[in-house]
Regions:
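Structural microenvironment flanking redox-active thiols in thiol-disulfide oxidoreductases
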Residues: 1-45
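Short, charged low-complexity intrinsically disordered segments located at boundaries
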Residues: 12-16, 47-54, 72-79
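Surface-exposed beta-strand edges and their flanking turn/coil or helix-capping segments
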Residues: 17-18, 46-49, 85, 94-97
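Short, low-complexity, polar/charged sequence segments that are solvent-exposed and flexible
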Residues: 21-25, 52-55, 89-92
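Sec-exported extracytoplasmic/periplasmic mature domains
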Residues: 22-26, 47-51, 78, 113, ...
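Structural micro-motif
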Residues: 29-31, 50-55, 64-71
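Thiol-/selenol-based redox modules, centered on thioredoxin-like
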Residues: 58-118
Length: 118
């Protein structure tokens, strides 16, 4: 499944996330939009669990900053990655917009198929 975790739980209530899902046509039963409090729990999960940056900031919506990256996690809880041309692990994908990073989306789709077949 897919878990999209809000970093602004005071703004992203279940009602707001439901509206967001409808607006963005997120209808698959295995895609979950999650929110929760306190912020520290969400921050710990993101920063230490997935090593994806989140933090409080003044210039961003809701006073929070985030990397915009996301990770694929297998059923054992491990972050899965592929390697670049030099053999270095690429742990994160940059965007969900196909027009912005078409190669990343293609790789993401390939990697999801691999995970689904395990």
């Amino acid at each position: 499944g897919i878990a999209s975790i809000s970093i602004t739980p005071d703004i992203d209530t279940p009602k707001v996330l439901k509206s967001y899902a409808k607006q963005n046509e997120i209808t698959h039963r295995n895609w979950h939009l999650l929110t929760g409090k306190p912020y520290d729990v969400v921050s710990q999960l993101s920063n230490k669990g997935f090593t994806l940056y989140t933090g409080k900031g003044d210039a961003t919506h809701g006073g929070f900053e985030h990397s915009g990256l996301f990770a694929l996690v297998d059923k054992e809880g491990n972050i899965r990655s592929r390697n670049d041309a030099y053999g270095n692990p690429i742990k994160f994908y940059r965007a969900l917009e196909e027009h912005s990073f078409p190669d990343q989306i293609k790789e993401l789709k390939e990697d999801i198929k691999i995970l689904l077949n395990e």
